UniProtKB/Swiss-Prot annotation:
Protein name: USG-1 protein homolog
Family matches, as Gene3D superfamilies: Dihydrodipicolinate Reductase, domain 2, NAD(P)-binding Rossmann-like Domain
Organism expressing this protein natively: Azotobacter vinelandii
UniProt-listed Pfam families: Semialdhyde_dh (PF01118), Semialdhyde_dhC (PF02774)
Any GO molecular function: oxidoreductase activity, acting on the aldehyde or oxo group of donors, NAD or NADP as acceptor
One GO-annotated biological process of the protein: amino acid biosynthetic process
InterPro entries documented for this protein: NAD(P)-bd_dom_sf, Semialdehyde_DH_NAD-bd, Semialdhyde_DH_dimer_dom
Similarity comment: Belongs to the aspartate-semialdehyde dehydrogenase family.
PANTHER family: ASPARTATE-SEMIALDEHYDE DEHYDROGENASE (PTHR46278:SF2), DEHYDROGENASE, PUTATIVE-RELATED (PTHR46278)
Coiled-coil annotated spans: none
Length: 336
């Protein structure tokens, strides 16, 4: 048993922050004092942890010298504002916002590239990548001995919880209005999300790509250690509360053996292969689980060098909170 360490969770009242609290308890993480931090508006709320009710504190007055490990589960602006304070206090940082540069806080998926952690200088900074990258990396990493990638094509259907509690509340409100015969009035989203599919998540740059799409490309390349890999990404917002659904098309430089691919996926950690005659879904399979699900493994209709997959994963749990806690466990195991 590792010695107990004092921990802070920034963004503790959000969907991911709350999931981190739950997973720390479930995995019997060696927690000493747990400090739950949020904005002043959320300060004073109560969160249950190991049979105790912990009071949420305002991050504005918090002294990071009180803790050894900090999870940043808030937005990028909050991370940019407070990460330097935590690092100056000598804390290990596990970021989930993607605010820190790739070179300073490398993106790591626990089952894919944990060796990166061994090279970090103290105090360590590491980033748990976007939940969609976690799902993609879990499915792609086992295929490296079998498939020489030339290009990845990704269509990612995101749930409204990827934008936090506000997204969840907005979908619930719009759905209720429609089912009661009232036209929904968009507030959080710029148009109707209930019973609809939005073809863009966030603002586009001059080339037409969103910040999230660029993030997925950059983080996937780093996690897979494939800096030159060509990746095309389209992110959609789906009228789903929780769970990422991804369509992945891999263009290889040689013909692909689907049987060998299935065998590799079946052995892969953090992944569950669904039978060929079935298809994983976020509601029926992925949500609440500690693995990502992959199915519909097949080659292209008329191209033996194309591999197509369908992936379903819990964006809050497997894709975010669990990976962050696993990274912290690895750092502690290394004696950081």
């Amino acid at each position: 048993m590792s010695p107990a360490i004092d921990i802070a969770i920034v963004g503790a009242t959000g969907t991911v922050g709350a999931a981190i609290v739950e997973i720390l308890e479930e995995r019997d993480f060696p927690v000493g004092q747990l400090h739950l931090l949020a904005s002043p508006a959320s300060a004073g709320k109560s969160v249950s942890f190991k049979g105790r009710n912990l009071r949420v504190k305002s991050i504005e007055a918090f002294d990071f010298a009180q803790v050894r490990l900090v999870f940043f589960a808030a937005g990028q602006a909050v991370t940019r504002q407070y990460a330097s304070q935590a690092r100056a206090a000598g804390c290990m940082l596990v970021d989930l916002s993607g605010a820190l540069p790739l070179q300073q806080a490398p993106r790591v998926v626990a089952e894919v590239n944990p060796q990166v952690l061994e090279k970090l200088e103290a105090p360590c900074q590491v980033t748990s990548p976007a939940s969609q990258v976690v799902a993609l990396a879990l499915a792609l990493a086992p295929l490296r001995p079998l498939v020489r990638w030339r290009h990845l094509g990704v269509t990612a259907c995101l749930p409204v919880s990827s934008l936090g509690r506000e997204g969840v509340a907005e979908l619930a409100r719009q759905t209720t209005e429609l089912l009661n015969g009232r036209p929904p009035k968009p507030r959080f989203f710029d148009r109707q999300i209930a019973f609809n599919l939005l073809g863009r998540v966030g603002d586009s740059d001059t080339a037409g790509h969103t910040g999230l799409e660029r993030r997925l490309v950059e983080e996937s390349r780093q996690v897979l250690d494939a800096p030159e890999l060509k990746i095309s990404v389209t992110c959609l917002m789906a009228p789903v509360f929780f769970g990422d659904s991804l369509s992945l098309a891999v263009q290889a430089s040689q013909a692909i053996d689907p049987s060998a691919v299935r065998a590799a996926l079946e052995r892969a950690p953090g992944l569950e292969l669904i039978e060929p005659d079935d298809c994983p879904t976020v509601i029926g399979d992925a949500v609440g689980q500690d693995v990502a699900y992959v199915g519909r493994v097949r080659t292209g209709v008329d191209d033996a060098c194309e591999l197509d997959l369908w992936i379903a994963s819990d964006n809050v749990r497997k894709g975010s909170a669990l990976n962050a806690v696993q990274l912290a466990e690895l750092l502690i195991k290394q004696g950081r």
